[in-house]
Amino acid sequence: MELETTKYFILAFTHKSMSLEMREKLAINSPAILKEFLQTIKNYCPNIKECMVLSTCNRFEIYASLKHNTHADEQKNALLKILAQNKKMSVSDLEKCVLMSTDESAVHHVFSVCSSLDSLVVGETQITGQMKNAYKFAFEEKFCSKDLTRLLHFAFKCAAKVRNLTGISKQGVSISSVAVKEALSIFEKEKIEDKKALVIGLGEMSQLVIKHLLNKQFEVLVLGRNAAKFEDFLKELEEPKKVSFQNIENLNAYINAYELLFCATSSPNFIVQNCMVKETIFRRFWFDLAVPRNIEKPIFNNIFLYSVDDLEPMVRENVENRQESRMKAYEIVGLATMEFYQWIQSLEVEPLIKDLRELARISAQKELQKAVKKRYVPKEYESNIEKILHNAFNAFLHHPTIALKKNAQKEESDVLVGTIKNLFNLDKSSTNHAQNLNLYKCEYYEE
């Protein structure tokens, strides 16, 4: 009897392989569109058991588990066709930029991404939260179950270990902090004394920008749609008096009044359009941190626009400064990948061990009941004898249990498990799926 091991599969498009223009086309910022896309995969790729999508400003990735004996290349071709049709792109263009990973390399990739080793800004912690949200959505919409839950559960543990055992996140660097650092450098070079900034949007990226600006003693005007959300956000700030709010409908009134602007919304269209921009005597510095981009390319020469990809050179110094921590982090990820597969293999024997113990308990209980019924054993001794039998079978199964767990990490474990199931007639035994899933349910709500 051959045990089916989970086949993990990933398609990845990242800032390393794909331009910002193409990543914009792939980006999914709407829950409704994401659900529709995942449903399309489910409908047209029957050999994909579970799937989820991670869509950020720097990457678009599909994580999946495949049915037994499924060819990864076939699933890759099917998914590229779905993407091409869904995003109105050519398969050949996507083929040039895609990275496919399976099995151990796929697991290693997920752990590296979650630990922020594959990020534009190495060590930034925002990606872990984004992965938790992506998993949460797919899990609650029933597109992923046991396989991806186990994978993501372990990935978050790996990311926490990387943060705790290396100094890779101590500087708190992120896209938002790099952007604010560059803005501060510009202000110093330009000798601009009036430290004011306009921030469009109130999502996670914008909130990080605001916090970094406040740390650098800027006054901030936020343009958004949700005043209640802004009031809740103020409670997180040490200096809330330096931040004010206006509805984004008033954008025209403020767009030409600030030298510094940051924009990061989930809108698929341009928020800042050239038709609303007027010429000014002062130079302006705009940071578009959204994907798809929120700011139309300016027509005036004294407006300097920075996109996410434009920040990459500013990030290189950060990467170089973290090489030692990065090497240690990769060691942790490599070890975690190995431990993950050992854990997965051990899970195959856990139900068997449970079934063996249950079989022993039931057999002992039956014989004890017979003995009591035939008065071989006084009724008042029944409880004590039951405890003795329980301890005896635990002692009897102790060594086999250890041996099973040890051999679960070996390639021949499927033969051993199959043989034991046949010997004890346990082939038809099954553990409740929902209970099994809860054991490995990922705490996506944790920090």
From Swiss-Prot:
Protein name: Glutamyl-tRNA reductase
Function: Catalyzes the NADPH-dependent reduction of glutamyl-tRNA(Glu) to glutamate 1-semialdehyde (GSA).
Active site per database record: 57 (nucleophile)
UniProt gene name: hemA
Annotated binding of substrate, by residue: 56-59, 119, 124-126, 130
Entry similarity comment: Belongs to the glutamyl-tRNA reductase family.
Other known facts: During catalysis, the active site Cys acts as a nucleophile attacking the alpha-carbonyl group of tRNA-bound glutamate with the formation of a thioester intermediate between enzyme and glutamate, and the concomitant release of tRNA(Glu). The thioester intermediate is finally reduced by direct hydride transfer from NADPH, to form the product GSA.
Subunit note: Homodimer.
This protein's pathway: Porphyrin-containing compound metabolism; protoporphyrin-IX biosynthesis; 5-aminolevulinate from L-glutamyl-tRNA(Glu): step 1/2
Keywords (A to Z) from UniProt: NADP, Oxidoreductase, Porphyrin biosynthesis
Catalytic activity: (S)-4-amino-5-oxopentanoate + tRNA(Glu) + NADP(+) = L-glutamyl-tRNA(Glu) + NADPH + H(+)
Top enzyme category: oxidoreductase
Signal peptide start and end residues: none
Chain positions of site Important for activity: 109
PROSITE patterns xrefs: GLUTR
Alphabetized CDD domains for the sequence: NAD_bind_Glutamyl_tRNA_reduct
EC number: 1.2.1.70
Organism: Helicobacter acinonychis (strain Sheeba)
Biological process according to GO: protoporphyrinogen IX biosynthetic process
InterPro entries, per database record: 4pyrrol_synth_GluRdtase (IPR000343), 4pyrrol_synth_GluRdtase_dimer (IPR015896), 4pyrrol_synth_GluRdtase_N (IPR015895), GluRdtase_CS (IPR018214), GluRdtase_dimer_dom_sf (IPR036453), GluRdtase_N_sf (IPR036343), NAD(P)-bd_dom_sf (IPR036291), Shikm_DH/Glu-tRNA_Rdtase (IPR006151)
GO MF annotations, alphabetized: glutamyl-tRNA reductase activity; NADP binding
Binding site for NADP(+): 201-206
Domain comment in the entry: Possesses an unusual extended V-shaped dimeric structure with each monomer consisting of three distinct domains arranged along a curved 'spinal' alpha-helix. The N-terminal catalytic domain specifically recognizes the glutamate moiety of the substrate. The second domain is the NADPH-binding domain, and the third C-terminal domain is responsible for dimerization.
